[in-house]
Every structure is written in C-alpha cells, then in structure tokens.
Amino acid sequence: MKLISLLFKQISVVILIDSISTLPSDTEKLCYNSVIVLKLSWSLTLHIQIFMEVWQYGKFQWNDPFFNNDMDDVFNQLFRRMDNQNSEVRGISLMDNRCHRMSLLNTEQLASYPKIIKQWKYLKMVNRLLKKEGFIEKLGTNLTEQARDGLLDPVIDRENEIQKPAQKFCRRRKKNPLLVGESGVGKTAVVEGLAQRIVAGKVPETIQDKEIYSIDLSSLEAGTQYRGSFEENIKQLVEEVKAAGNIILFIDEIHQILGTGALAGEEVKGLADIIKPLLCHVAKLSVIGATTQDEYRNTILKNAALARRFNDVVINEPTAADTLRILQGIKELYEKHHHVVLPDDEKKAAVDYSIKYIHNRHLPDKAIDLIDDCGSFSGKNSQTDVETLDQRLKNKRQLRRPAIKSEDFAKAADIKRVDRGTKQKIKKTHQKEKITATIDDVAQSVERLTGIPVSDMGANDIEHLKNLDKRLKVMVIGEDEAVKMVAKAIRRNRAGFSEGDQPKGSFLFVGPTGVGKTELSQALALDMFGNENALFGIDMSEYADRTAVSKLIGTSAGYVGYEDNANTLTERVRRNPYSVILLDEIEKADPQVLTLLLQVMDDGRLTDGQGSVIDFRNTIIIMTSNAGFGNEALSGDKQRVQSLMDKLAPFFAQNFRPEFRNRLDNIVEFSHLTKQDLSQIVDLMLADVQKTLAKKSIKLEVTKAAKDWLMEQGYDEAMGARPLRRVIEQQIRDKVTDFYLDHLDVKNLKADLVDAEIVISAA
C-alpha cells in the first residue's frame, strides 16, 4: 500500500493533462481497496501502464503480498479491452519483462496508441522516482536509462570495440571486461555505446535486459568516517545488484579500487579486496572497467589475483578517417549547442590539425575538443534577444510547477502554450543567426590550445615563405649564402615536399667564431615561430662525458632523478614541440651523444628515459662548430680558397661517422666578415642600444665619425663581430650610463668623436 501511495504522490509532478476517461471496474476496485481516490484525469492507457509498473515493482522488489499472481489475469484482461483484435502481445508474461521496457507493445500497436508514445517519458520519470529509493541510484548513474531518454551522445563507428565487451558478458564466469587504452581514445564512449545497443536490442540475448550503472567511487567512500561504514556501503550495493539480477557496474579509472576504502597503516580491506571473490562467481557481480595502459600495467597487473578476474579489451586510437566519421555523426549536437554551422572542410581541418599540432593527446578526443572550441569561438557573439527569450522561458517554467502542485491545471496548460510559442521564437532566431565556422577558426582554436601560430597554406603564407631569406638577411649580415641554403630547406619542408618524418630542418653551421651562427638561429626562431623564446640552446661542452646522455633524455629507471626530468631536451620539446634546438659547439660532445641524435634526424622522434616517444618533426635542429676555422685558416691565401669539405675532413674523420653526415640537410659554411659587413652590423647593434634607451624615453644620435671609429676599433677578421659588441658596450652603453646619472632630466643625447674618443653630450 505504501508503494501505491508513493506512486500517486510523486505522479502529480509529472501529470500530463489529458481527456477525462472512465476507469474500468477492476481498476476502480483495486484503487478503492488501496484507499486511493483518483482525482486526476488520465487516459485509460496511462492507468494500465502505471498499474502494470506498480505491480512489477511491488512483486519483485518489495515482495508486497498485495501483488499476487492473480494480477497477471487482471492486466491481461485490461489489455484485451484496449485491443480485442490483436492479442498476440497479451500473452507475453509480465513476469519476464522489466518495467522500463516497451516490449509489451510492438511497432504497429504503438502507432495505434499515440498517447502511449506521448506519455512514455512521464512514465519513465515515475520509474526513476521509485528507483531513487535504492542505494545504487545514490552512487551512480543509469547509463541505459540515459540512453533511452536520448541523453547520451551518439557513438559512431565503434562497432568492433562495443561488440568485444558485449561478448565477454556472455561468458558463464568472470564476465568482467576491462577496457584498456590511452586517455581520450573513447573508452567511456564504448560503454555508452553498449548501453545504446542494449536499448536498441542490438546485443546478444544474454544481456538484452541489462542495466549499466556508472559508479562514483567517491560517493561510495563518502561519509564512512566510522569503522565498518565503508564495508556496509559495499555490502548494501552488492545486495541490491544481486537482487536486481540485471545490473552491470561500470567503474571508470578502475585502478582506483585498489586504494579505495583502505586506511594507511591499518589492516582494513579495500574495495578491491571485498569484491574480488564476487567477480569470478557465476551470477554474482558483473563489472566493466576502464583504465589507461600505464595504470593497468602499474596497478592491475601487479595484483595477479585481481587481474585474472578481468578480461582485458584493448581500445586503440581510431584512425583519421574513423575520427572524421565520428565528427560527422556528432556535428549536429555541437551545431545546436553553439548555433553555428560546421561544414565538412572544417571538420577535416580539425582532424588534420589535431594530428599535426596536438601531440600529447589522442584521437578522437583532441579533434572533438577542436570542434567544440571552434564552435564556441565562432558563435561567441550571440544576440541579446535570444538570452532574453531563454530567461523568459525559465521564468515561465518556474511558474508552472506551483500551478501543477496546486492542481490549477488550466493555468498550467496556459503556461505550457506560452512555452511552445517562446521555443518557436528561439528556434527562428537561432536559424537566422547561425554562423558558418571556417578553417581559420580551427587554426585559431589550435593556437589557443597549444600556443602554436597556425595558419593555412594560403597566399599570405606562401609570400611569407618566399621572402624568408630576404628577412633573414636583414638580421644576419654578410652570410647571404648560408641564409639562402637554410631558407631553401625550410621552404621545402613547409610546402610539404620533404620526404619522411624528419625535423623541419637539420643543419650544421661551420665557420669562424663571431660571424653570426647563433644570430641566424635566433632570427630563424623569431621568423618561423614568432618568438625568440622558441630557441633553446645547449652548450655541448657540458656533454663531453658519456654519462651526460641522461641530461638529454632523462635518467633511466632505478637511478637518482628518474622522476625529475623537467630540464631535459626531450621534456622541453614535449612541452614546446615548435622550437629551434641549438647544439652549440657540437665537436665538444661525446660521440655517444651524436649517436643519440641519429634517430632524431632520421625519424623525427626520440624515446626518453621513461619510455615516452617525443616528436621532433616540428623542430629545427641547428648544430654549430668552429672546427677547421682556427687562426691557422688565416695564415695564407691557399687556405683561404680551400674547399669546405677539405677544411672539415680531419674533424669529420675524428668525430662524425658517415651515417651522421648523411642525415644532415645541409652543411652551411659561414665566411669571415669584411669591414663593409661590419659597418652594417654597427647599425644593428646601435639599434639595440636605442631600444634599451627608449624604455626611459631617451633618444641617442650617433654621428658617422663615431660609427666609423667604433667599426675600426671593433674589427678583427679572426674574431668576427664579438669584439665590436664589446667596444659598443664600453664606449656607448657605459658612457651613456655615466651621463644619465649626472643629467637625469636630459632625454636627447648625442655620441660624437672628439680627439679619438667617444663623447656623450646633450643633443
């Protein structure tokens, strides 16, 4: 009786105003015997369905003596009154069907009873209200129920992955599939897809009546501050699962069960210890779990007793073509949410960009994130009137609930009609305002997510590549041939005509000191990646020892510093895959370090000390060397015209093996600087001084005589431009500093040559 009362107390929340109908005599007697007065006007069909569900819950869940076997005859008689012509479905035993299934009526009969279809969502809401009394409803979410309500996203093109766990549930014992795969490959989506297939009946007969519940481990552990509370929760959960007989528990991040409920330093059983015996028994407990490859290896496999109770199902990353089909299947959800149109080329760009630029995540998750971010960016300028209509709709719904509770159904019906009109206005407004997302929006989404300046290969980018050498020549003086060789290699790679998976470029810069090898590297980083911080240099003199290899890839397992690899080459590339790597003075490194670089230059990847594969395909690797360009290179004209390979032959024979030389894109020779080159370098260095002074609103004018004197003092063919930098530091920066400290109010300065000395004065 309590159950019947509870039903009619709760049903007032979900009542659907309908035509008044007369109850059959059997039903009237049943209601009056239950001391329930039906004041609500429902259709006959709704009454029959509700009483059928009450009977099933009362008989199987609560064992109420009111619900006896004679009720079968009552309901069969009621169904015959509904449709005397077709009674095939009446013979279906109500005891063999769960209250949540519509299998009592076939498709033709559903078409004959449109009110059943219209009111079915309200019946399901009643079921949920009844089942909320159960402990399992407090711990998790019924994915199968969500699938019936259409609350789950469609699962596209994952049939093989869904059928594998479905087949595992057909076993007699150990019906516990464990989904193992990297994060983002769709493990949870496979479980949701299984729930959808159960609702659609596209699973083996053994599991067609199953309910999948996603369990929240934190809810299971919450409030268990007293000894035995946690075990009591587990016991109650297991008892409900056994009593239902058709529940599958889904535990995401299932490796956490090894620590859930266990107290440090105390002999208390955890969740894994308690459910472990139940997992291998017949018809005791069915669990489907999900975890990553690393967690599976480090936790589950180490517990052999737990591992043998699961059947692992590997979920691999979908291909680019599969991901594109997934995006095609879910695009309507994101178009509706963001009020934008997502064309096919935009989805194709999302897949391509996610593969090319987002390396530490997996498909399809990263491609879906790009679509979502792109949609939010494209539809960010929503009109205010849409928000006003949404707010009006919410306010009307709030007024509708009190009207239903007070049984003012006329007012509730009026509010519902207003709701329909408001929804139509919102729909029309959205249709007018829909914006079409573009490939540029996807590129901007990639830039927001990764910080990488991404642009499509359009006209602007082509011009940018064509003029690369011109821009570099402005910043690197006197090395036109070197700049030209580097620009050719970069253009070839960016245009997509390079073969293999090599880095964007791998160069060996050779030449005397101070001629611009490092300067060209900095200019290249600024031009290619828009930031000088994209260049990180490594002084290879620190790698003269063979054991220093760990500084590049991290310490191996079992050695000190295994967990701390933040400053290694591989970690820095993982965090910033678009960068210029400068290996300065490569000839000073141990040959073992050079051997390590072979894989980088050939395959564009390197495995670090922890076993992770780092992608180097988007880096530019530059090695510098002074070998063959010492002071002896200036001793005579014969050596001046000596070929590059002749100069490098002794060095290569000693340090570089043939396979290393063959993997270089180019060996770039830098020549000695002339006085004419140095005159242009003076202007560049003085421009840097001007930038520094501009921070204090100071302007400096340098006369031609002063520039010529600085060039003469700083010229050294053997040493390059570095002596000139020291001269400017001493003669300009230091003297400007002294003058500024004595004359704080002077903002316009002048540097002139007086008696063979630089003098700073007010302009």
From Swiss-Prot:
CC annotations in GO: cytoplasm
GO biological processes: cellular response to heat
Record region (II): 437-629
Transmembrane spans: none
Residues the record lists as binding ATP: 181-188, 511-518
PANTHER family: ATP-DEPENDENT CLP PROTEASE (PTHR11638), ATP-DEPENDENT CLP PROTEASE ATP-BINDING SUBUNIT CLPL (PTHR11638:SF188)
Protein name: ATP-dependent Clp protease ATP-binding subunit ClpL
Species this protein is from: Lactococcus lactis subsp. lactis (Streptococcus lactis)
